[in-house]
């Protein structure tokens, strides 16, 4: 999974979202240890201070926690991860519906089209 950034929002906020996505998708395992700040910053091609800022914010939310000599770990709170997963999905759906509306689809037409395409993909 590559790290993709745009110029519309601060990088650290995009890092937070992408780390959350990696957690809910299983790239980073629940209860598992995260790579070091430097390693993650290198992988994402960002400044380590920017990565540190994102990880500090994730710690503040409780999704990630530090153990002094062992590094950072992902919470095992499945409810928290489910809430984050649903939040990420909601954002994607809202963007999708907004874009479909921009090209002239009503919500009902969009739902019908999604159902048709979903059946075709099976």
Residue spans for each PLM region:
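Extreme N-terminal segment that seeds HTH/winged-HTH DNA-binding domains in transcriptional regulators
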Residues: 1-33, 39, 87, 91-122
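Alpha-helical and His/Cys-centered functional microenvironments
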Residues: 24, 56, 76
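N-terminal helix-turn-helix
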Residues: 33-65
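Short, Lys/Arg-rich nucleic-acid/phosphate-binding segment
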Residues: 34, 66-74, 78-79
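Hydrophobic alpha-helical segments, especially transmembrane helices
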Residues: 39, 52-54, 69, 73, ...
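Short Asp/Glu-rich motifs
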Residues: 42, 77-78, 119-120
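A general secondary-structure boundary signal
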Residues: 48, 61-64, 71-73, 116, ...
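Short, charged/polar, Gly/Pro-enriched secondary-structure boundary elements
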Residues: 80-85
